[in-house]
Amino acid sequence: MAILELKDIHKSFRDNVVLDGIDLSVNKGDIIGIVGPSGTGKSTLLRSINLLERPEQGEIQFEDITIPLPLKSKDRKKVTELRKRIGMVFQRFYLFEHKTALQNVMEGLITVQKKSRQEAEKLALEALENVGLKAWQNHYPRHMSGGQQQRVAIARTLAMRPDIVLLDEPTSALDPELVTEVLTTIKQIAEQGYTMLLVSHEMDFVSKISTRVIFLDGGKIIEDGSPSEVFRHPKSDRAKEFFEKMNKLKEPDYFI
């Protein structure tokens, strides 16, 4: 049964149509990889789900919350409730530099969920342990690698106990050698049963972790199926062309 449905979502930036009538149904436990060319609306789609971007047309249905678009002032409480239940991990870490890892993870629990400091600390420590950083709880972001900072950001999201986790290119700001530790963390939380939507250029990772893959181009979903169907047997010429180019990029330029 779907816990999230997007219906006829449209989003433009001036004359540039970024999302052009998106329909998407997400079931509990889905791990949906979102792939496609750069600039085709992948990040905008994620940001539209929790209304960081505000579509001009459509409807968002999340369990018992229905939000018609464009947004009206009377729906502000619904937006707040939606954001409490959908967590997001961004390309950048957005950690507070003057707070420790533990304090960063506790922040939303105290300010948004109104937890007591004692309960917030307990939940934050559990989340840091989940991403392998409990021992780093008293370190400040400046003393941590980019990969560790992103894992703290993931812990911050998980501590809020979201129903859905959105991940927007979570490794794009990292040095190549730090990518693996973050992907390993994402794989571990996926195995815990979270419902996830992941935008990433790490195609091999997306193909292995996802239960379902959608391919966006020109603001439309033109492929939607299992990883095998989309990556190996795409139906559209555009997806075939895209994956052929991606495969060529992985081929060595020369042989010794």
What are these regions (language model features)?
Residues N50:
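Helix-to-loop junction immediately C-terminal to a conserved catalytic motif
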Residues I67-G87, R117, V230-P234:
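ABC ATPase NBD coupling module
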Residues Y140-M144, Q148:
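Conserved ABC ATPase signature
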Residues A159-D163:
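A short, proline-enriched helix->beta-strand linker immediately N-terminal to the Walker B motif
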Residues V165-D168:
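Catalytic Walker B motif of ABC-type/P-loop ATPase nucleotide-binding domains
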Residues D224-G225:
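ABC ATPase "signature
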